[in-house]
Amino acid sequence: MSEQTKSDLKRQHILDTGRALVIKHGFGGVGIARLLSECNIPKGSFYYYFASKDAFGQALLQDYVHDYLSRIDTLFTDAGTAYAKLDKFWSAWLAQAGSEGIATQCLVVKLGAEVADLSEDMRIILDDGVDKLVTRIAGLLRDGVQDGTVRSFADPDATARMLYAKWLGAAILAKLSRTQTPLEQALAETSSHLSPHNT
């Protein structure tokens, strides 16, 4: 293994560990000392990769957005109708047997309000990631009109953003209530809203 590969793996280990901690405790709740302890690395190693905690936060969000969109692209390019792909995406927000759903792992849900006030650079990264996701959802809405599985909307882009906002709200309510009921309601409402039979 080359030194560059080892360096890349160590950096990724810090980001992966940081993501797990931030999902649980929030960005402000994770100090560098705790991160170093969890990663079992010296302080110098952290500052070799990241100039500051804010720089670490930016890298963490860039890594998260890239990973998230890559998984979405895989899902959205699978075989099947546009409606089936959208239904699979929304259903993935709910916890399934043996695994957590997207809602519990979503850094937009966890950090959106926090980083918007904390770091302009981090806010921009998350906002750009949301824009790219919404664009993908809007594309599937258009595809669904073409394949006859999704009703036609006057403004697919606005509809996609509205649907994503609905799911963010449902995810926050699910965290507050510690139940999946808000997500289940969002799934039922979204399915009804998209159906070409409910025009």
Pin down the residues of each PLM region.
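C-terminal peripheral helix-coil segments that are non-catalytic and often amphipathic
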Residues: K88-Q96, D131-D143, D147, D157, ...
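Amphipathic alpha-helical segments used for helix-helix packing
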Residues: K85, E100-D121
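Generic hydrophobic, amphipathic alpha-helix propensity
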Residues: K10-G18, L35, L60-Y64, Y68, ...
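Small-residue (primarily alanine) positions within well-ordered alpha-helices
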Residues: T17-G18, C39, G144, A160
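Short, solvent-exposed amphipathic helices
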Residues: D63, T74, D121-K132, G139
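Hydrophobic alpha-helical connector segments
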Residues: A59, D73-T104, P156-L163
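Helix-turn-helix
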Residues: H13, A20-A55, A59
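N-terminal intrinsically disordered/low-complexity leader segments
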Residues: M1-L9
